[in-house]
Amino acid sequence: MSKEEFMKIQTCVLKVNIHCDGCKQKVKKILQKIEGVFTTKIDSEQGKVTVSGSVDPSVLIKKLAKSGKHAEIWGAPKGNNNPNQSQMANQFKGMQIDHGKAGGGGGGNNNNNKKGQKNGGGGGGGGGGGNSNAPKMGQQLNPQHLQQLQQLQKMKGFQDLKLPPQLKGSVPVNKNQNQKGVKFDVPEDDDDDDFSDEFDDEFTDDDDDEFDDEFDDLPLPSNKMKPNMTMMPNAQQMMMNAQKNANLAGGPAKNGGKGAPAAGGGGAGGGKGAGGGAKGGPGNQNQGGGKNGGGGHPQDGKNGGGGGGPNAGKKGNGGGGPMAGGVSGGFRPMGGGGPQNMSMPMGGQMGMGGPMGNMPAVQGLPATGPGGAPQGYFQGAGIDPMQMQQQQQQQQYLAAVMNQQRAMGNERFQPMMYARPPPAVNYMPPNPHQYPNPHPYPYPYPYPYPPPYGNDQYSHAFSDENTSSCDIM
Protein backbone atom coordinates (compact mmCIF):
# COMPACT_ATOMS: atom_id res chain seq x y z
CA MET A 1 0.00 0.00 0.00
CA SER A 2 1.45 3.29 -1.05
CA LYS A 3 1.76 6.29 1.18
CA GLU A 4 -0.93 8.18 -0.69
CA GLU A 5 -3.40 5.35 -0.23
CA PHE A 6 -2.49 5.10 3.41
CA MET A 7 -3.13 8.81 3.89
CA LYS A 8 -6.52 8.47 2.30
CA ILE A 9 -7.64 5.87 4.82
CA GLN A 10 -10.12 7.33 7.27
CA THR A 11 -12.43 6.07 9.91
CA CYS A 12 -16.09 7.05 9.78
CA VAL A 13 -18.61 6.34 12.51
CA LEU A 14 -22.22 6.06 11.46
CA LYS A 15 -25.41 5.71 13.45
CA VAL A 16 -27.64 3.12 11.82
CA ASN A 17 -31.01 1.79 12.99
CA ILE A 18 -30.26 -1.84 13.88
CA HIS A 19 -33.09 -3.81 15.45
CA CYS A 20 -31.93 -7.41 15.29
CA ASP A 21 -29.16 -9.68 14.07
CA GLY A 22 -30.69 -9.76 10.62
CA CYS A 23 -30.37 -5.99 10.38
CA LYS A 24 -26.78 -6.26 11.53
CA GLN A 25 -25.90 -8.78 8.83
CA LYS A 26 -27.70 -6.77 6.19
CA VAL A 27 -25.80 -3.59 7.03
CA LYS A 28 -22.52 -5.46 7.07
CA LYS A 29 -23.12 -6.94 3.62
CA ILE A 30 -24.07 -3.57 2.19
CA LEU A 31 -20.95 -1.90 3.52
CA GLN A 32 -18.63 -4.67 2.37
CA LYS A 33 -19.90 -4.39 -1.19
CA ILE A 34 -18.90 -0.73 -1.39
CA GLU A 35 -15.52 -0.04 -2.96
CA GLY A 36 -12.98 1.54 -0.66
CA VAL A 37 -14.33 -0.02 2.56
CA PHE A 38 -11.61 -1.96 4.36
CA THR A 39 -13.03 -2.89 7.76
CA THR A 40 -16.47 -2.74 9.31
CA LYS A 41 -17.34 -2.91 12.99
CA ILE A 42 -20.96 -2.91 14.14
CA ASP A 43 -22.28 -2.35 17.67
CA SER A 44 -25.89 -3.49 17.44
CA GLU A 45 -26.89 -2.30 20.91
CA GLN A 46 -26.00 1.32 20.25
CA GLY A 47 -26.54 1.18 16.50
CA LYS A 48 -22.94 2.32 16.03
CA VAL A 49 -21.19 1.32 12.79
CA THR A 50 -17.46 2.06 12.41
CA VAL A 51 -16.17 1.95 8.84
CA SER A 52 -12.52 2.45 7.87
CA GLY A 53 -11.52 3.01 4.28
CA SER A 54 -11.02 5.55 1.57
CA VAL A 55 -14.67 6.08 0.78
CA ASP A 56 -16.73 9.19 1.31
CA PRO A 57 -19.20 8.87 4.23
CA SER A 58 -21.90 10.44 2.07
CA VAL A 59 -21.59 7.45 -0.27
CA LEU A 60 -22.07 5.09 2.65
CA ILE A 61 -25.14 6.98 3.81
CA LYS A 62 -26.64 6.91 0.30
CA LYS A 63 -26.05 3.19 -0.10
CA LEU A 64 -27.64 2.42 3.24
CA ALA A 65 -30.58 4.70 2.51
CA LYS A 66 -31.27 2.87 -0.75
CA SER A 67 -31.44 -0.40 1.17
CA GLY A 68 -33.92 1.04 3.65
CA LYS A 69 -31.50 1.81 6.47
CA HIS A 70 -31.32 5.34 7.77
CA ALA A 71 -27.76 6.37 8.65
CA GLU A 72 -26.24 9.45 10.22
CA ILE A 73 -22.73 10.58 11.06
CA TRP A 74 -21.89 9.67 14.63
CA GLY A 75 -19.56 11.82 16.70
CA ALA A 76 -16.15 13.01 15.51
CA PRO A 77 -14.46 10.94 12.82
CA LYS A 78 -10.72 10.28 13.04
CA GLY A 79 -8.10 11.41 10.56
CA ASN A 80 -7.10 14.78 9.18
CA ASN A 81 -8.21 14.30 5.60
CA ASN A 82 -11.87 13.72 6.31
CA PRO A 83 -14.00 14.54 3.27
CA ASN A 84 -16.77 15.55 5.65
CA GLN A 85 -14.54 18.30 6.95
CA SER A 86 -13.71 19.49 3.48
CA GLN A 87 -17.39 19.39 2.61
CA MET A 88 -18.22 21.57 5.55
CA ALA A 89 -15.34 23.87 4.70
CA ASN A 90 -16.66 24.26 1.17
CA GLN A 91 -20.05 25.19 2.55
CA PHE A 92 -18.54 27.93 4.69
CA LYS A 93 -16.13 29.28 2.09
CA GLY A 94 -18.79 31.29 0.33
CA MET A 95 -20.12 32.67 3.58
CA GLN A 96 -18.42 35.56 5.24
CA ILE A 97 -20.40 36.16 8.34
CA ASP A 98 -20.17 39.34 10.34
CA HIS A 99 -21.45 39.97 13.84
CA GLY A 100 -25.00 40.69 12.77
CA LYS A 101 -24.49 44.41 12.13
CA ALA A 102 -26.72 45.83 9.43
CA GLY A 103 -24.22 48.06 7.65
CA GLY A 104 -25.25 51.58 6.99
CA GLY A 105 -22.74 52.22 4.24
CA GLY A 106 -23.52 49.27 2.03
CA GLY A 107 -20.21 47.45 2.45
CA GLY A 108 -19.27 44.80 -0.03
CA ASN A 109 -19.06 41.94 2.48
CA ASN A 110 -22.18 42.61 4.52
CA ASN A 111 -24.22 39.62 3.44
CA ASN A 112 -26.53 39.16 6.41
CA ASN A 113 -29.17 41.63 5.45
CA LYS A 114 -32.62 40.47 6.35
CA LYS A 115 -33.87 40.15 2.79
CA GLY A 116 -30.76 38.46 1.39
CA GLN A 117 -30.30 40.67 -1.66
CA LYS A 118 -27.66 39.77 -4.23
CA ASN A 119 -27.14 43.21 -5.75
CA GLY A 120 -23.57 44.49 -5.65
CA GLY A 121 -22.58 47.02 -3.03
CA GLY A 122 -24.75 49.90 -3.91
CA GLY A 123 -24.27 51.87 -0.72
CA GLY A 124 -27.16 53.41 1.13
CA GLY A 125 -28.72 52.73 4.49
CA GLY A 126 -29.94 49.26 3.62
CA GLY A 127 -26.49 47.75 3.31
CA GLY A 128 -26.98 45.68 0.18
CA GLY A 129 -24.83 42.58 -0.12
CA GLY A 130 -21.96 42.90 -2.54
CA ASN A 131 -20.76 39.28 -2.62
CA SER A 132 -22.23 37.15 -5.36
CA ASN A 133 -21.92 34.10 -3.10
CA ALA A 134 -24.14 35.62 -0.43
CA PRO A 135 -26.72 33.15 0.85
CA LYS A 136 -30.38 33.89 0.44
CA MET A 137 -32.91 33.78 3.21
CA GLY A 138 -33.29 30.03 2.97
CA GLN A 139 -29.52 29.44 2.70
CA GLN A 140 -28.60 30.77 6.10
CA LEU A 141 -27.31 28.37 8.69
CA ASN A 142 -30.01 25.99 9.71
CA PRO A 143 -29.82 24.10 13.02
CA GLN A 144 -28.38 21.02 11.29
CA HIS A 145 -25.45 23.01 9.91
CA LEU A 146 -24.91 24.57 13.30
CA GLN A 147 -24.79 21.14 14.89
CA GLN A 148 -22.24 19.99 12.35
CA LEU A 149 -20.22 23.13 13.00
CA GLN A 150 -20.13 22.31 16.68
CA GLN A 151 -18.93 18.84 15.77
CA LEU A 152 -16.17 20.37 13.67
CA GLN A 153 -14.99 22.35 16.65
CA LYS A 154 -14.60 19.17 18.65
CA MET A 155 -12.71 17.33 15.96
CA LYS A 156 -9.03 16.65 16.15
CA GLY A 157 -8.09 18.24 12.86
CA PHE A 158 -10.10 21.39 13.27
CA GLN A 159 -6.99 23.55 13.12
CA ASP A 160 -6.19 22.37 9.59
CA LEU A 161 -9.52 23.43 8.16
CA LYS A 162 -9.49 26.30 5.73
CA LEU A 163 -12.32 28.19 7.29
CA PRO A 164 -12.94 31.95 7.18
CA PRO A 165 -11.37 33.89 10.03
CA GLN A 166 -14.79 34.65 11.46
CA LEU A 167 -15.44 30.95 12.03
CA LYS A 168 -11.97 29.86 13.08
CA GLY A 169 -11.87 29.35 16.83
CA SER A 170 -14.54 31.96 17.54
CA VAL A 171 -17.37 30.50 19.56
CA PRO A 172 -19.21 33.81 20.10
CA VAL A 173 -19.59 34.19 16.34
CA ASN A 174 -21.30 30.83 16.20
CA LYS A 175 -23.63 31.76 19.01
CA ASN A 176 -24.49 34.96 17.27
CA GLN A 177 -25.03 33.08 14.04
CA ASN A 178 -27.34 30.72 15.86
CA GLN A 179 -29.42 33.66 16.92
CA LYS A 180 -29.46 35.02 13.40
CA GLY A 181 -30.46 31.66 12.00
CA VAL A 182 -33.62 31.31 14.04
CA LYS A 183 -34.62 34.93 14.29
CA PHE A 184 -37.56 36.24 12.33
CA ASP A 185 -37.85 39.59 10.61
CA VAL A 186 -40.37 40.93 13.08
CA PRO A 187 -39.31 41.01 16.74
CA GLU A 188 -41.09 38.28 18.60
CA ASP A 189 -41.13 39.85 22.04
CA ASP A 190 -42.81 43.02 20.87
CA ASP A 191 -45.46 41.06 19.04
CA ASP A 192 -46.18 38.88 22.01
CA ASP A 193 -46.41 41.83 24.35
CA ASP A 194 -48.64 43.79 22.01
CA PHE A 195 -50.81 40.76 21.36
CA SER A 196 -51.32 40.02 25.01
CA ASP A 197 -51.83 43.70 25.85
CA GLU A 198 -54.36 44.00 23.07
CA PHE A 199 -56.42 41.14 24.37
CA ASP A 200 -56.02 42.27 27.95
CA ASP A 201 -57.09 45.82 27.15
CA GLU A 202 -59.83 45.21 24.63
CA PHE A 203 -61.48 42.09 25.92
CA THR A 204 -60.59 41.13 29.46
CA ASP A 205 -60.44 44.45 31.27
CA ASP A 206 -63.19 46.11 29.29
CA ASP A 207 -65.54 43.21 29.77
CA ASP A 208 -64.91 43.13 33.48
CA ASP A 209 -65.33 46.88 33.79
CA GLU A 210 -68.51 46.83 31.73
CA PHE A 211 -70.16 44.14 33.76
CA ASP A 212 -68.91 45.63 37.01
CA ASP A 213 -70.32 49.04 36.17
CA GLU A 214 -73.68 47.95 34.84
CA PHE A 215 -74.59 44.99 36.96
CA ASP A 216 -72.36 44.18 39.92
CA ASP A 217 -71.99 47.56 41.60
CA LEU A 218 -75.64 48.62 41.36
CA PRO A 219 -77.53 48.03 44.61
CA LEU A 220 -81.01 46.64 44.44
CA PRO A 221 -83.77 49.27 44.60
CA SER A 222 -86.02 49.43 47.60
CA ASN A 223 -89.01 48.13 45.67
CA LYS A 224 -87.10 45.16 44.29
CA MET A 225 -86.52 41.97 46.20
CA LYS A 226 -83.47 39.77 45.93
CA PRO A 227 -84.17 36.86 43.61
CA ASN A 228 -84.86 33.55 45.26
CA MET A 229 -82.68 30.95 43.59
CA THR A 230 -85.14 28.13 44.30
CA MET A 231 -88.05 29.79 42.49
CA MET A 232 -88.99 29.92 38.87
CA PRO A 233 -88.39 33.23 37.05
CA ASN A 234 -92.11 33.77 36.54
CA ALA A 235 -92.77 33.38 40.23
CA GLN A 236 -90.04 35.90 41.02
CA GLN A 237 -91.52 38.42 38.61
CA MET A 238 -94.99 37.96 40.09
CA MET A 239 -93.70 38.41 43.61
CA MET A 240 -91.81 41.55 42.63
CA ASN A 241 -94.93 42.93 40.99
CA ALA A 242 -96.92 42.14 44.09
CA GLN A 243 -94.51 44.08 46.27
CA LYS A 244 -94.55 47.05 43.93
CA ASN A 245 -98.34 47.01 43.79
CA ALA A 246 -98.59 46.82 47.54
CA ASN A 247 -96.44 49.90 47.94
CA LEU A 248 -98.47 51.81 45.37
CA ALA A 249 -101.89 50.86 46.68
CA GLY A 250 -104.34 53.74 47.17
CA GLY A 251 -102.59 56.28 44.98
CA PRO A 252 -103.30 57.23 41.41
CA ALA A 253 -101.82 54.93 38.80
CA LYS A 254 -99.01 56.20 36.61
CA ASN A 255 -99.82 54.34 33.45
CA GLY A 256 -103.07 52.67 34.23
CA GLY A 257 -103.80 49.03 33.67
CA LYS A 258 -102.05 48.78 30.33
CA GLY A 259 -98.71 50.38 30.99
CA ALA A 260 -96.80 47.85 33.04
CA PRO A 261 -95.08 44.97 31.30
CA ALA A 262 -96.61 42.43 33.65
CA ALA A 263 -100.13 43.81 33.40
CA GLY A 264 -103.02 41.46 32.73
CA GLY A 265 -105.84 41.90 30.34
CA GLY A 266 -107.48 44.55 32.45
CA GLY A 267 -111.12 44.80 33.34
CA ALA A 268 -113.89 46.58 31.61
CA GLY A 269 -113.37 49.60 33.78
CA GLY A 270 -109.58 49.41 33.94
CA GLY A 271 -108.04 52.81 34.49
CA LYS A 272 -106.02 54.31 31.66
CA GLY A 273 -105.18 57.74 33.01
CA ALA A 274 -103.93 59.12 36.25
CA GLY A 275 -107.34 59.04 37.88
CA GLY A 276 -108.32 55.51 36.94
CA GLY A 277 -111.26 54.45 34.78
CA ALA A 278 -114.86 55.41 34.85
CA LYS A 279 -115.87 52.65 37.20
CA GLY A 280 -112.54 51.62 38.61
CA GLY A 281 -110.84 52.89 41.68
CA PRO A 282 -107.49 54.60 41.81
CA GLY A 283 -105.89 51.68 39.94
CA ASN A 284 -102.44 50.28 40.40
CA GLN A 285 -99.47 50.27 38.13
CA ASN A 286 -99.69 46.60 37.28
CA GLN A 287 -103.42 46.02 37.74
CA GLY A 288 -106.42 46.94 35.76
CA GLY A 289 -108.32 48.36 38.69
CA GLY A 290 -112.02 48.20 37.73
CA LYS A 291 -114.84 46.39 39.44
CA ASN A 292 -115.02 43.59 36.95
CA GLY A 293 -111.38 43.53 35.97
CA GLY A 294 -108.97 41.19 37.68
CA GLY A 295 -105.53 42.81 37.79
CA GLY A 296 -102.38 41.60 36.18
CA HIS A 297 -101.47 39.22 38.97
CA PRO A 298 -101.84 35.49 39.51
CA GLN A 299 -104.47 36.03 42.18
CA ASP A 300 -107.12 37.94 40.30
CA GLY A 301 -109.44 40.62 41.59
CA LYS A 302 -112.59 40.01 43.56
CA ASN A 303 -115.11 42.25 41.84
CA GLY A 304 -112.68 45.11 41.83
CA GLY A 305 -112.58 46.63 45.24
CA GLY A 306 -111.20 49.75 43.65
CA GLY A 307 -107.91 48.06 42.90
CA GLY A 308 -106.90 48.56 46.48
CA GLY A 309 -104.29 45.87 47.02
CA PRO A 310 -101.89 43.68 45.16
CA ASN A 311 -104.41 40.86 44.92
CA ALA A 312 -108.01 41.82 45.34
CA GLY A 313 -109.63 38.54 46.22
CA LYS A 314 -110.59 35.37 44.42
CA LYS A 315 -113.33 35.96 41.84
CA GLY A 316 -111.62 37.86 39.10
CA ASN A 317 -113.40 37.78 35.76
CA GLY A 318 -110.25 38.27 33.73
CA GLY A 319 -106.58 38.81 34.12
CA GLY A 320 -103.38 37.18 33.11
CA GLY A 321 -102.55 34.93 36.04
CA PRO A 322 -101.59 31.31 35.61
CA MET A 323 -104.87 30.15 37.21
CA ALA A 324 -107.34 32.90 36.58
CA GLY A 325 -110.33 33.01 38.86
CA GLY A 326 -108.93 30.89 41.66
CA VAL A 327 -106.08 30.25 44.00
CA SER A 328 -103.09 28.78 42.21
CA GLY A 329 -101.65 25.65 43.73
CA GLY A 330 -99.71 26.40 46.85
CA PHE A 331 -100.25 30.17 46.98
CA ARG A 332 -102.18 31.71 49.78
CA PRO A 333 -105.10 33.98 48.85
CA MET A 334 -103.92 37.51 49.36
CA GLY A 335 -106.31 40.04 50.79
CA GLY A 336 -107.09 43.30 49.12
CA GLY A 337 -106.67 45.64 52.05
CA GLY A 338 -103.48 47.40 52.92
CA PRO A 339 -99.95 47.00 51.66
CA GLN A 340 -99.01 43.50 52.66
CA ASN A 341 -95.41 44.05 51.61
CA MET A 342 -94.82 40.98 49.50
CA SER A 343 -96.67 38.50 51.66
CA MET A 344 -96.73 35.37 49.53
CA PRO A 345 -95.68 32.39 51.62
CA MET A 346 -94.99 29.18 49.83
CA GLY A 347 -97.08 26.28 51.06
CA GLY A 348 -95.69 22.79 50.78
CA GLN A 349 -92.87 22.22 48.34
CA MET A 350 -92.16 25.30 46.18
CA GLY A 351 -95.79 26.19 45.83
CA MET A 352 -96.45 23.17 43.68
CA GLY A 353 -98.89 21.43 45.97
CA GLY A 354 -96.68 18.54 47.01
CA PRO A 355 -93.90 16.94 45.08
CA MET A 356 -95.77 13.83 43.95
CA GLY A 357 -99.00 15.30 42.67
CA ASN A 358 -100.67 15.42 46.07
CA MET A 359 -103.13 17.95 47.40
CA PRO A 360 -101.88 21.48 48.09
CA ALA A 361 -100.62 21.93 51.59
CA VAL A 362 -102.13 24.22 54.16
CA GLN A 363 -99.81 27.05 55.06
CA GLY A 364 -97.71 26.22 58.08
CA LEU A 365 -98.20 22.45 57.84
CA PRO A 366 -96.28 19.97 55.76
CA ALA A 367 -97.85 18.55 52.66
CA THR A 368 -99.74 15.30 53.04
CA GLY A 369 -98.80 12.09 51.33
CA PRO A 370 -100.96 9.94 49.09
CA GLY A 371 -102.29 7.89 51.95
CA GLY A 372 -103.21 10.84 54.11
CA ALA A 373 -100.23 10.43 56.39
CA PRO A 374 -97.98 13.44 56.89
CA GLN A 375 -94.78 13.36 54.94
CA GLY A 376 -91.39 13.12 56.51
CA TYR A 377 -87.99 13.42 54.97
CA PHE A 378 -89.06 11.11 52.16
CA GLN A 379 -91.77 13.15 50.45
CA GLY A 380 -94.82 11.28 49.33
CA ALA A 381 -94.05 8.13 51.30
CA GLY A 382 -97.32 6.87 52.68
CA ILE A 383 -98.54 3.66 54.24
CA ASP A 384 -97.85 0.45 52.41
CA PRO A 385 -100.54 -2.23 52.93
CA MET A 386 -97.98 -4.98 52.44
CA GLN A 387 -96.00 -3.51 55.27
CA MET A 388 -99.08 -3.70 57.47
CA GLN A 389 -99.29 -7.42 56.88
CA GLN A 390 -95.66 -7.94 57.72
CA GLN A 391 -95.60 -6.01 60.94
CA GLN A 392 -95.81 -9.16 63.05
CA GLN A 393 -92.60 -10.47 61.56
CA GLN A 394 -90.67 -7.32 62.33
CA GLN A 395 -90.70 -7.70 66.08
CA GLN A 396 -86.95 -7.35 66.33
CA TYR A 397 -87.31 -3.76 65.10
CA LEU A 398 -89.87 -2.80 67.70
CA ALA A 399 -87.45 -1.15 70.12
CA ALA A 400 -85.96 0.94 67.37
CA VAL A 401 -89.42 1.89 66.17
CA MET A 402 -90.33 3.17 69.63
CA ASN A 403 -87.40 5.55 69.60
CA GLN A 404 -87.77 6.67 66.01
CA GLN A 405 -91.43 7.67 65.99
CA ARG A 406 -92.09 11.33 65.27
CA ALA A 407 -94.95 13.53 66.30
CA MET A 408 -96.55 13.45 62.88
CA GLY A 409 -97.06 9.70 62.86
CA ASN A 410 -96.16 7.09 60.32
CA GLU A 411 -93.01 8.41 58.75
CA ARG A 412 -89.95 6.75 57.36
CA PHE A 413 -86.85 6.87 59.48
CA GLN A 414 -83.78 8.91 58.84
CA PRO A 415 -81.26 7.03 56.73
CA MET A 416 -78.41 5.55 58.75
CA MET A 417 -74.94 5.00 57.45
CA TYR A 418 -74.82 1.20 57.56
CA ALA A 419 -78.36 0.13 58.46
CA ARG A 420 -81.06 -0.69 55.97
CA PRO A 421 -84.15 1.50 56.24
CA PRO A 422 -86.78 -0.46 58.18
CA PRO A 423 -90.38 -0.39 56.98
CA ALA A 424 -92.85 2.00 58.56
CA VAL A 425 -94.78 0.17 61.27
CA ASN A 426 -98.34 1.26 61.90
CA TYR A 427 -99.91 0.63 65.28
CA MET A 428 -103.06 -1.00 64.08
CA PRO A 429 -104.84 -4.14 65.28
CA PRO A 430 -103.08 -7.15 63.81
CA ASN A 431 -104.94 -9.30 61.38
CA PRO A 432 -105.37 -12.68 63.11
CA HIS A 433 -105.63 -14.50 59.78
CA GLN A 434 -102.18 -13.35 58.70
CA TYR A 435 -100.24 -14.74 61.68
CA PRO A 436 -97.85 -16.32 60.95
CA ASN A 437 -97.43 -14.82 57.51
CA PRO A 438 -95.53 -17.17 55.17
CA HIS A 439 -94.33 -14.28 52.91
CA PRO A 440 -96.97 -14.44 50.19
CA TYR A 441 -95.53 -11.45 48.32
CA PRO A 442 -92.05 -10.12 47.73
CA TYR A 443 -90.81 -7.21 49.77
CA PRO A 444 -91.44 -3.71 48.37
CA TYR A 445 -87.74 -2.84 48.82
CA PRO A 446 -84.91 -3.04 46.34
CA TYR A 447 -83.18 -5.51 48.71
CA PRO A 448 -85.40 -7.79 50.79
CA TYR A 449 -84.94 -8.40 54.48
CA PRO A 450 -83.83 -11.83 55.61
CA PRO A 451 -86.73 -13.93 56.86
CA PRO A 452 -87.00 -14.14 60.65
CA TYR A 453 -85.70 -17.31 62.20
CA GLY A 454 -88.05 -19.68 63.94
CA ASN A 455 -86.77 -19.79 67.49
CA ASP A 456 -83.61 -17.71 67.70
CA GLN A 457 -84.75 -14.30 66.51
CA TYR A 458 -83.89 -12.32 69.64
CA SER A 459 -80.35 -13.52 70.34
CA HIS A 460 -78.93 -11.70 67.32
CA ALA A 461 -81.36 -8.78 67.19
CA PHE A 462 -79.10 -6.41 69.11
CA SER A 463 -75.83 -8.16 68.42
CA ASP A 464 -72.70 -6.19 67.67
CA GLU A 465 -72.10 -8.20 64.53
CA ASN A 466 -75.56 -7.73 63.09
CA THR A 467 -75.47 -4.01 62.34
CA SER A 468 -78.52 -4.09 60.09
CA SER A 469 -80.88 -5.09 62.88
CA CYS A 470 -80.64 -2.07 65.17
CA ASP A 471 -80.84 1.55 64.17
CA ILE A 472 -79.58 2.81 67.51
CA MET A 473 -76.14 1.50 66.69
From Swiss-Prot:
A lipid is attached at residue 470 (S-farnesyl cysteine). Residues 96-139, 162-230, 246-343 are annotated as: Disordered. CDD domains: HMA (cd00371). InterPro entries: HMA_dom, HMA_dom_sf. The modification Cysteine methyl ester is found at residue 470. Residues 471-473 form a propeptide. Residues 118-131, 253-339 have a biased composition (Gly residues). A metal cation binds at residues 20, 23. One of its GO terms (cellular component) is plant-type cell wall. One of its GO terms (molecular function) is metal ion binding. The keyword Cell inner membrane does not apply. Induction: Down-regulated by cadmium. Residues 9-72 form the HMA domain. Residues 187-217 have a biased composition (Acidic residues). Keywords: Lipoprotein, Metal-binding, Methylation, Prenylation. PANTHER family: HEAVY METAL-ASSOCIATED ISOPRENYLATED PLANT PROTEIN 32, HEAVY METAL-ASSOCIATED ISOPRENYLATED PLANT PROTEIN 33-RELATED. Heavy-metal-binding protein. Belongs to the HIPP family. This is Heavy metal-associated isoprenylated plant protein 32. It comes from Arabidopsis thaliana. The gene is HIPP32.
